[in-house]
Amino acid sequence: MFELQVVSNTPMNAVDDADVVAETFLVQIGYLPKGYDPHTGDLSVRDSIPYRLFMRYLMDKPDKAWTVDELAALLETTRPTIYRHINKLKSMDLLESLDVMTADGQVRKGYRIRYGDLTKAWSFTEANVSLAMENYRKTAARLQELTRQRAEQS
């Protein structure tokens, strides 16, 4: 199911700090909640698991497909925690899954930014937003029509 938070925003073209842009962007799209307070002993959002997962692994190595076990070990957390954050990014259509050969020769599912490029991945997100907005418009029109019919029958 596609899910994304959409808020009015200004492009951050004048900001040169990738971490500032990332933190703002990730809050705006709903990946990180506004006022996010890490549940662990992390000192800041940038030390948190969801932020490091996105920036230090998915964005810093966009061509690599990461397994959940790799990410859990690197981030020193549990597999369910990794899945929770992976699923949130998948719901925004920002990630793709690929088969990955592990060191022991097994094939596992790995995740990376779609096409290894956030800009290209975002085009999928935009397409989903357009479709969702069109469906909302149709639903609003249907509600208006049904309400008008009900008023005429009264």
Kindly label every feature range from the protein language model.
Residues 1-44, 48:
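N-terminal leader segment of winged-helix/HTH proteins
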Residues 45-50, 100-125:
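Short, cationic-aromatic polyanion-contact patches
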Residues 55-58, 87, 141:
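Surface-exposed alpha-helical segments enriched in charged/polar residues
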Residues 65-75:
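A short alpha-helical element within helix-turn-helix/winged-helix DNA-binding domains
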Residues 76-91:
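Short amphipathic alpha-helical interaction segments
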Residues 116-154:
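Amphipathic alpha-helical dimerization/coiled-coil segments
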